């Protein structure tokens, strides 16, 4: 591979993965769609410069390996070095929930939000069961599967993840303050903003903010202006702390406020009651007489587009929509 800040396409990594095109970019580096030449499968290739100031790819690879076998955890195909890059090859997944939210005009139906909530809680429960916390829960880091796994939600990007408990002794990490902020400001927990060591409760609180983001279309602290990122984080933190949960969740079923209030009451080392939280939303789902048929909003929109195309042209045409059923061009590595 040629050494440059932007890797070239049409080259091999790991002796078998041919880069096709770039499909993502972030502070971590580049993400490419690639073809496995041994079986012609599409995969995602994440590239990180060996000269990066804060290398994270090896750490992320080790955590993915540690989590292998869990539902909604992408499979690692290969890790190694090519010229000036650390390389991670993994399953190619579908679009992120942020992509799909934009496709759906930045509003999800209650049915879609509740079906997603169930899977989101289960994904983070598994991660916590492996003594890890994610610390960057946000819509970009939940991706839908493709092909036979089109209805399955995947949790990705473990570059900021951390052990909260020792695997051997079971000892929980100590409560600390004065920590640097870690995460994404609009979804981060209040404790993360305050510099308090994160634990399981913080991941759960972040899920609550993501759900309300999907319900409302935006959160009250989004779009705040500030001269620096630090000042913006401070403004977001202040607004989060001064916005009552009941105000944030006003106009939506009480279960969302109940969820967030429960998470905010958790103590630092306390294990969340994942079953209780899932049940909150499952009971609401049944109360609203929804059918758990995986008819997510983007699937319904795609079907309508296909029907319109068919009726206007006289033949079925596949709509160009970012659904997990047919789009294989989005990588696991969408990151903002």
UniProtKB/Swiss-Prot annotation:
Enzyme class of the recorded protein, top EC level: transferase
Biased composition (Basic and acidic residues): 327-336
Binding site for ATP: 23-31, 46
Keyword Acetylation tagged: no
Protein name, entry field: Casein kinase I isoform beta
CC per GO annotation: cytoplasm; Golgi membrane; nucleus
Pfam families, per database record: Pkinase
PROSITE patterns, sorted: PROTEIN_KINASE_ATP, PROTEIN_KINASE_DOM, PROTEIN_KINASE_ST
Biased composition, class Low complexity, residue ranges: 309-320
Keywords: ATP-binding, Cytoplasm, Kinase, Nucleotide-binding, Serine/threonine-protein kinase, Transferase, Wnt signaling pathway
Top-rank taxon: Eukaryota
InterPro entries: CK1_Ser-Thr_kinase, Kinase-like_dom_sf, Prot_kinase_dom, Protein_kinase_ATP_BS, Ser/Thr_kinase_AS
Region (Disordered): 309-336
Family classification: Belongs to the protein kinase superfamily. CK1 Ser/Thr protein kinase family. Casein kinase I subfamily.
Gene Ontology molecular function, alphabetical: ATP binding; protein serine kinase activity; protein serine/threonine kinase activity
Gene label: CSNK1B
Entry EC no(s): 2.7.11.1
One example of a Gene Ontology biological process annotation: signal transduction
Function per UniProt: Casein kinases are operationally defined by their preferential utilization of acidic proteins such as caseins as substrates. It can phosphorylate a large number of proteins. Participates in Wnt signaling.
Reactions that this protein is recorded to catalyse: L-seryl-[protein] + ATP = O-phospho-L-seryl-[protein] + ADP + H(+); L-threonyl-[protein] + ATP = O-phospho-L-threonyl-[protein] + ADP + H(+)
SMART domains in the record: S_TKc
Subunit structure: Monomer.
Active site: 136 (proton acceptor)
Species for this entry: Bos taurus (Bovine)
Segments forming domain Protein kinase: 17-285
Primary residence: cytoplasm
Localization in the cell: Cytoplasm
